[in-house]
């Protein structure tokens, strides 16, 4: 039996919001603006597509800064993530990351967790590492993108059980494609997640108990 579990990255596998930390590197004013936009999007107050390019234009990140955020993801990794993912894989689960974050930032964390499949937004840089743009057609740059990707991966892997773990409204959108949605509240307890998630976990190790009958 093929089993697929997808994890959000920011405020789930790691305690930080990568885009906010990139903004912090650009200065206090940029950080405040970007943090506000991120919170509004994660709470479902404004569509993701409305803020995606605005945040990156404000930040103008370099490749080096993105790699620094990769290190920050590792430093702030959810304490039970490594062991939980290792146990899930031993139980036959295919573990993937589906994120509205950036591939360049997430790769180091994924490698540490031994997750080979990352569905996240590609950024483009010139030969000096200066920011050129992002893939504006990538599904997770808009609302509805995560269920689209989860459906594609589930089909490609012929998964009979599909699970999503995440903290935000964009993650909750996958419920229906995912036969189980687990709202994650360790770092952010968002009202829509608390009210609408069939399962809640405050640490990733609790995912193992929730899925013990699968």
List the predicted regions and their residue ranges.
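N-terminal glycine-/serine-/threonine-rich phosphate-binding loop
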Residues: 1-3, 8, 194, 204
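Alpha-helical substrate-recognition element adjacent to the catalytic core
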Residues: 3-122
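C-terminal cap/substrate-recognition subdomain and adjoining C-terminal extension
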Residues: 72, 76-94, 101-214
């Amino acid at each position: 039996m093929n089993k697929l579990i997808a994890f959000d990255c920011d405020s789930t596998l790691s305690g930080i919001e990568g885009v906010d930390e990139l903004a912090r590197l650009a200065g206090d004013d940029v950080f405040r603006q970007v943090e506000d936009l991120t919170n509004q999007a994660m709470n479902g107050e404004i569509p993701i597509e409305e803020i995606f390019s605005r945040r990156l234009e404000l930040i103008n990140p370099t490749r080096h800064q993105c790699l620094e955020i990769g290190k920050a993801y590792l430093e702030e990794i959810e304490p039970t993530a490594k062991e939980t993912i290792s146990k899930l894989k031993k139980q036959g689960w295919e573990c993937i990351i589906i994120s509205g974050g950036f591939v360049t930032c997430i790769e180091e964390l994924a490698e540490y967790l031994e997750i080979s499949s990352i569905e996240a937004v590609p950024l483009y840089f010139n030969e000096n590492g200066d920011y050129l743009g992002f893939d504006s057609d990538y599904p997770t740059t808009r609302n509805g993108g995560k269920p689209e990707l989860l459906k594609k991966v589930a089909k490609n892997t012929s998964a009979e059980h599909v699970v999503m773990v995440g903290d935000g409204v964009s993650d909750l959108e996958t419920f229906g494609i995912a036969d189980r949605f687990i709202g994650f509240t360790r770092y952010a307890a968002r009202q829509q997640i608390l009210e609408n998630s069939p399962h809640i976990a405050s640490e990733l190790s609790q995912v193992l108990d929730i899925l013990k009958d699968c």
